[in-house]
């Protein structure tokens, strides 16, 4: 119990700069693995199937990102409430918040998955997906919607771990899931010749196992926190409403950006599969580039919530200054790297001729 408390409350006792950067580092690695996890589908189909296969996965990517944004935004919002209870030492309330979060997002993800399955083809039609890649794009997206609860539960549980001051467990799970996804991608595509279906099924299996392991580890971790005088509840409606108020701005922030990208993707789709493939490769590189900024922002969110819960407003201001300069430094470095080595990065997804077009 002592070890659990130490790790959980490091955000309250360590120097703000040290606490934030040490907490953010596993988040950066974890987010990189998350992007690597997603990118492998594109790399495998682009290199071992065809340009059209890459285009079909890329055309679906903008849609999947909207749902990922909802999961991440919701998890970030809920983690604020969890961190506040943890910072205030109200551990039973913290457990109730975790349980309420998991139940809420399991129901939401199932509903969104059902919606996606019902309107799968209609969504792609509205996005102007070309006929020559429509069938594969619809297949990839359909399998993705079946696995939506797995994706939601992993991302939300990762946010819960972060809110508890544990950014290492999500990283370990992502490494496991990413490696499994790569092996299954190559197995299903190269050995079983399943093409687009293969990478979609591989992703579903890897996400499912990752979500299940995450749940088991989280339950074990929560048992390490002592019970206090407050009553535990599996689901608290008032707390769910409070979480919704906090999470909604985060969900909207994440989703509006992705909806904008979705509209751009709809325009790109009118130019044919070659342009879609090039654009898909470019957006994957962009996703990697913004990882450090997102991770530091998430670290600051957890840092702020825990310290506000404990009444340490001065530490929050100090942490903000550290984040500001760290983000500015990352932005300059990443801008230079993408400008200098953009063509090299694109070649990871496409052959030489297609890379030149991209």
Task: Go through each PLM region and give its residues.
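Short runs within selected transmembrane alpha-helices of multi-pass transporters and secretion channels
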Residues: 75, 144-162, 170-178, 199-214, ...
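Interhelical loop/hinge segments that connect adjacent transmembrane helices in multipass membrane
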Residues: 2-24, 203, 215-257
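Membrane-interface helix-loop junctions in multi-pass transport and translocation proteins
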Residues: 178-212, 342-344, 348
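Short membrane-interface helical motifs at transmembrane helix boundaries
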Residues: 111-138, 142, 333-356
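Signature of the first transmembrane helix
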Residues: 18-79, 83, 248-268
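Small-residue-rich hydrophobic transmembrane alpha-helices
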Residues: 54-114, 151-170, 278-342, 346
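Alpha-helical transmembrane segments of multi-pass membrane proteins
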Residues: 131-154, 287, 293, 354-358
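Helix-terminus/linker motif at the lipid-water interface of multi-pass membrane proteins
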Residues: 32, 36-54, 124-131, 187-194, ...
